[in-house]
Amino acid sequence: MHCPFCSATDTKVIDSRLVAEGHQVRRRRECTECHERFTTFEGAELVMPRVIKRDGSRQPFDEEKLQSGMLRAVEKRPVSMDEIEQALSKIKSTLRATGEREVPSEMVGNLMMEQLMNLDKVAYIRFASVYRAFEDVSEFGEAIAKLQK
């Protein structure tokens, strides 16, 4: 690792610790040339799969889009940001765990509905009505009946 102060190529690790629930390593380093100390963080680069849209096009996974969809669904509902972040994290973990380079958008939508069903039933119905393109009241009734089982 290059020293950020003098650009020397040789540094030594003084201390290493696991941080972020074991997902990162914090290292305290010292330059062997100028003796300045600095901290580095190392973590695995986790690549999200690409999303195959209904029309067959492919696009990179968009975390912002996922978050905005969930925020829209839970708007004015008693759901904390912490609960939202945990749900989004579960969706991303599940997508990574598939081991696939590409996943269908339906899978992302279904994972979103599954998390919303656990968070807030009204938010689930809101999202499902748009995602499934409900056309009449009977489709709402079917979705509500599914929740009551």
UniProtKB/Swiss-Prot annotation:
Zn finger regions (unnamed) covering which residues? 3-34
What is the required cofactor set for this protein? Zn(2+)
Q: Which InterPro entries match?
A: ATP-cone_dom (IPR005144), NrdR-like_N (IPR055173), RNR_NrdR-like (IPR003796)
Q: Where are the transmembrane segments?
A: none
Xref: HAMAP family: NrdR
Which source organism? Shewanella sp. (strain W3-18-1)
Q: Which residues form the ATP-cone domain?
A: 49-139
Q: Which residues form a coiled coil?
A: none
Q: How is the cofactor bound?
A: Binds 1 zinc ion.
What family is it from? Belongs to the NrdR family.
Which GO molecular function annotation, any one, does this entry have? ATP binding
Any one GO biological process: negative regulation of DNA-templated transcription
Q: Write the protein's name.
A: Transcriptional repressor NrdR
Relate the protein's function as given in its record.
Negatively regulates transcription of bacterial ribonucleotide reductase nrd genes and operons by binding to NrdR-boxes.
| Cysteine pairs bridged by disulfides in the record | none
Q: Which UniProt keywords apply?
A: ATP-binding, DNA-binding, Metal-binding, Nucleotide-binding, Repressor, Transcription, Transcription regulation, Zinc, Zinc-finger
Q: Name one Pfam family in it.
A: ATP-cone
Out of the domains of life, which is the source? Bacteria
